[in-house]
Amino acid sequence: MTIVLQISDTHIAAHGRLVSDQLDTASAFESLVKRIIQIRSEIGKVDAIIASGDLSDDGTTNSYEIFKNIIETLDIPTFVIPGNHDSRSRLRDAFSVDGYLPKVGKLNWHVPLADFHLIGLDSLVEGMPGGEVDTSTLAFLSDKFEALDSAPVLLALHHPPFKSGIKFMDEIGLQGVRHFHNVLKSYNGEVRLICGHIHNLMVMNVAGHVALSAPAPTSSFSYNLQDNALKGFMRIEDGFLLHRWSNGFQSVRISTHKGEGPFPF
């Protein structure tokens, strides 16, 4: 059994700055890490952590230092992809010592695990809130799929390859979706797609595969389907996702806070 934890949209700011003058994102991330420590005896060995973008809110070197100082207390191999708030070059520099990130170009990578393959895709368009699966990323994924020969894949990118229904988030969504879907359709193995960006857990079918977006440790966006919905965030510590392989993928949301109980019934 292979277990990967997905953490997304931590939005760490340099020097402890409050994000939007509201959110102590470093403190919220510390609470999430403490929760992971709390449940480790319950879930067993965790093989890897995937941070699915927007590790930083401001793309600064110091914000990545803070992120690493917090996550390293877990002593679990951690793999990262950039989101729209990240700096590709500074993210690369911060995690280059781990050896899986390419030295130049997009931060697309592949790591084999015991029961499945973990692939990270770079959807960042520098300076833009929306994302893109460009031709180089499509070629990278196509080549990997051909080499993996239908083996199961946990595939991560920051921007969801589907519409959320939240208008102001869909306006800064993913470009190149049609070509991305075509590559996915060509793969005969099981793919579990995981992403971030929309700060909500959502589940969709994308090109015949299950796709999930992760909650965020500090904030969420109201699921308001109206065109005139207010643009803004809700303060809520909404947890993370656990993905495991046991004769197929299973994905579970785990809250940052334990709650009361368990009580007998």
Regions found by a protein language model. Give the residues of each.
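Active-site environment of divalent metal-dependent phosphoester hydrolases
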Residues: 12-15, 57-62, 84-92, 126-129, ...
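N-terminal active-site segment of His-dependent metallophosphoesterases
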Residues: 1-66, 106, 164
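His/acidic metal-ligating clusters that form di-metal
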Residues: 32-49, 130-210, 239-242, 250, ...
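Active-site neighborhood of phospho(di)ester-bond hydrolases with catalytic His/Asp-centered motifs
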Residues: 6-8, 48-54, 78-84, 122, ...
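Acidic, His/Gly-rich catalytic cores of divalent-metal-dependent hydrolytic chemistry
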Residues: 208-209, 213-265
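Short glycine-enriched, charge-decorated loop/helix-capping segments at active-site entrances
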Residues: 18-24, 97, 127, 166-173, ...
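Active-site-proximal beta-strand elements of phosphoester/diester hydrolases
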Residues: 2-14, 115-125, 154-157, 209-215, ...
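Extended active-site neighborhood of metal-dependent phosphoesterases/phosphodiesterases
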Residues: 61-142, 179-189, 215, 230-244
